A protein has these predicted regions:
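Solvent-exposed, acidic/polar segments of extracytosolic/periplasmic ligand-binding ectodomains
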Residues: 137-198
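Extracellular/periplasmic periplasmic-binding protein-like sensory domains
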Residues: 36-109, 120-123, 169, 175-197
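Short, charged, surface-exposed loops that flank catalytic or proteolytic processing sites
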Residues: 120-134
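Surface-exposed patches in mature extracellular/periplasmic domains of secreted proteins
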Residues: 99-106, 126-129, 147-151
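An alpha-helix initiation/capping motif
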Residues: 27, 105-113, 130
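Alpha-helical elements of the RecA-like P-loop NTPase motor core of helicases
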Residues: 31, 57, 113
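Extracellular/periplasmic Venus flytrap/periplasmic-binding protein
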Residues: 1-40, 79-87
Length: 198
């Protein structure tokens, strides 16, 4: 878990010549891989798509121009044009200034809204787990993601987007939403879930 040199993996990718590379390595390893992949020149030949944990705004600020050309698949970005997201991002900026906001904060915000909706859906002094779970599954929240609900296996059903790295007015790179790639997409195994929602 402390690998810093990815020369062997990059050589394997170069030899294999795949149509694309999907990378998921959050934190320092992901930063090292991304920088070395860009330095190798492979990004010009073989596109890279990453998980949002591998390239959020914090990481973009660290790697800078090394992120140019990388694509991200994500269910949230700070430029989403919906009222709840605009309110959330404005509140974040008011409290934290220019500290980068990531999908972790957005998920935490939505999770708190879901918990509140679940609690509002039960009554009495004691909370029954079944009743609470049922209230969660039927909860309607004003999500920062836009359309959002929980599927039968309690995993999100949500839209997914392609993000790219753009240059801001200040000359610094940032993540920009390019297009929606999936609508109301849930866990493909949800139908096989044996969990009793009732």
């Amino acid at each position: 878990m402390d690998q810093t040199d990815f020369a062997a993996e990059i050589a394997q990718i170069r030899a294999a010549k795949p149509a694309m590379v999907y990378e998921f390595e959050p934190g320092g390893m992901g930063i090292a891989f991304l920088q070395q992949y860009q330095q190798s020149g492979l990004l010009k030949e073989i596109p890279m798509v990453v998980h949002p944990a591998s390239l959020d705004q914090v990481i973009v600020n660290v790697v800078g121009k090394a992120a140019d050309g990388v694509r991200v698949t994500s269910h949230w970005n700070d430029d989403f044009d919906n009222p709840e997201n605009k309110k959330f991002v404005a509140a974040w900026k008011a409290k934290f200034g220019d500290r980068p906001i990531t999908y972790y904060a957005a998920q935490g915000y939505d999770a708190a809204l879901m918990m509140g909706a679940g609690l509002a859906g039960v009554s009495g002094d004691e909370i029954d787990a079944k009743t609470f779970r049922k209230a969660l599954l039927s909860a309607q929240i004003p999500s920062v993601r836009g359309e959002f609900k929980l599927g039968p296996n309690q995993h999100p059903v949500q839209d997914w987007y392609a993000l790219g790295v753009a240059e801001g007015a200040n000359g610094k790179p940032y993540l920009k939403t390019e297009k929606k790639v999936l609508t109301a997409h849930g866990d493909i195994y949800a139908a096989q879930c044996k969990m009793d929602a009732e």
